[in-house]
A protein has these predicted regions:
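Alpha-helical recognition/docking segments in bacterial nutrient-uptake
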Residues: 9-121, 182-186
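Short, solvent-exposed amphipathic alpha-helices that sit
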Residues: 25-43, 115-118, 140-160, 202, ...
Length: 282
């Protein structure tokens, strides 16, 4: 075991064990992010230690025992970060964290609001003025994507009520049951904006099994532009975020902190853009 200064170990804290009802590392976004961090870290002569972060004490124990030089943290909220930083004096960069107020910690994320706005604006321009927004939570990135979507839907003077924000269960079997229950409403709305590619692709497969055609009967959009977005048929219209770039920026900033540099900007918000493919009927 390495001790003292200069362990050259970077801890990657994963704050959730499950995503979409499966192990979090099975999620395309998480896998690509952590895979990029691992490759770039080793290119810099460091090593990656993956740490389960649901127990803050577990992070404290492992990071202290192995004397990690810094932490990249995915899936923590402000309260969890505060609790960890009180117990552990390490350099930390959070990824996709959302405080209640202004940022007081180092974070690397994306412009979730803009992505939601771009999707909402596009669907509205295609005539889907009653499109629904579908997500697994009502917080963090899901919430900001909804706010952008809502703003775009209302820019022509209309009203996008909270009832158009559909929250679906985290477990797959319960989600599919919810899709079946909401099918009449989905068909009436004619367009669904999902807060992740994973859920959008899952829904397209569900509709196919039910004999419902995408986009002829229901238009579907995702968010992230994962590797699977262009593999499914129809190819998924989605919001592209540069996941390798997010990983690169987070690691680059952590290395600067480790080397004693001061970072003036607290929140780095990487841009996103709409990718039009075949899952929306224009």
């Amino acid at each position: 075991m390495l001790s003292g200064h200069g362990s050259r170990i970077i801890g990657v804290v994963l704050g959730f064990s499950y995503a979409h009802g499966m192990q979090s590392l099975q999620d395309p976004f998480v896998g690509e992010l952590i895979g990029t961090i691992q490759m770039e870290t080793e290119e810099n002569g460091y090593y990656v230690m993956l740490i389960g972060g649901e127990s803050i004490q577990n992070v404290v124990d492992i990071a202290s025992k192995w004397n990690v030089e810094g932490l990249l943290i995915l899936g923590y909220n402000e309260e969890q970060y505060r609790s960890l930083s009180r117990r552990l004096n390490k350099k930390m960069i959070l990824i996709d964290a959302y405080p209640e107020g202004a940022y007081t910690f180092q974070n690397v994320g994306i412009d979730d609001y803009s992505g939601g706005y771009q999707i909402g604006e596009y669907l509205y321009s295609c005539g889907y003025k009653k499109a629904l927004f579908v997500a697994e939570t009502e917080r963090d990135s899901d919430y900001y994507r909804w706010m952008g979507f809502k703003q775009a839907m209302e820019k022509q003077g209309g009203f996008c009520s909270r009832s158009r924000y559909i929250v679906i269960p985290g477990k797959r079997n319960l989600r599919l049951r919810k899709y079946r229950e909401l099918l009449p409403r989905f068909l009436e709305a004619k367009a669904l904006a999902f807060s992740s590619d994973y859920n959008a692709i899952e829904a397209i497969n569900f509709f196919f099994d039910e004999g419902i055609m995408v986009p002829e009967q229901i238009s579907v959009t995702g968010y992230d532009d994962s590797v699977y977005a262009s593999m499914i048929r129809p190819k998924l219209t989605t919001v592209h975020q540069d996941i390798p770039q997010k990983a690169h920026v987070a690691l680059e900033r952590l290395m600067k902190l480790i080397q004693g540099e001061t970072l003036n900007e607290l929140n780095i918000k990487n841009p996103v853009y709409l990718v039009k493919r075949d899952s929306v009927k224009e």
